[in-house]
Amino acid sequence: MRCQGSDGQLDVAACDLAAVDGLETPGLSRADLVGNPRPVIVNVFASWCVPCRAEHGVLTQMVEKDGLTLVGINYKDKPEDATKWLAELGNPYERIGSDLSGRVGIEWGLSGVPETFIVGSDGTVLFRYVGPVVGETAISTFREALIQAGALARGQNG
C-alpha cells in the first residue's frame, strides 16, 4: 500500500486502509476521500495518545452539530485497544483505517498524533492541524480552516 502518486508526492486519495479488527466501522479507501460535496476531515488518532482523548469530544461535537464528515486513521494501535477506547468515548468516525505499521503516518509526514487534515474533493490536503484540536484558539483556528475549505458556512457555530 502506497500513499504517493507517480510523482512521489503525497496522494491521500491513493491510500486504502483495512478496517480496524473488531470494529463494525468500515475501513478507509480512496473512494471515501474524493468526490465528496464537502471536504472530509481525516483525524489520525490512537488509544494510547492522551491528547487524542482530549480532542475526541471536540471532534464528536463538530460532527454532531455541524454535520461534518469525519474519518479516522488508527495509528500504531492494537485493534482491541482502539475498539475499547471507541466503545468508551463514542465513535464519531464514518470510516476508520488501520495503520498498525505506521506506514501511512510516514508517508503523510506525521510528526505525532493527533494530527487532523482537511481533504478536498480531489484528494488534496487543504489544511493540516498538528496536535490536539482543544482550547479556544485551536478550535477557532480549525473552524476557520473548515470555513476556508468550504466544509462550514461562515457563521455556522458548533
Give the location of each predicted region.
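Thiol/disulfide oxidoreductase modules built on the thioredoxin-like
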Residues: 87-92, 99-158
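A short beta-strand-turn-helix
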Residues: 3-4, 8-40
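Extracytoplasmic/secreted envelope proteins and their assembly/folding machinery
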Residues: 56-60, 79-86, 136-139, 143
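Conserved redox-active cysteine motifs that mediate thiol-disulfide chemistry
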Residues: 44-61
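Conserved segment of the thioredoxin-like fold in thiol-based oxidoreductases
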Residues: 54, 69-100, 113
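Short pre-active-site segment immediately N-terminal to redox-active cysteine/selenocysteine motifs
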Residues: 37-40, 45-48, 112
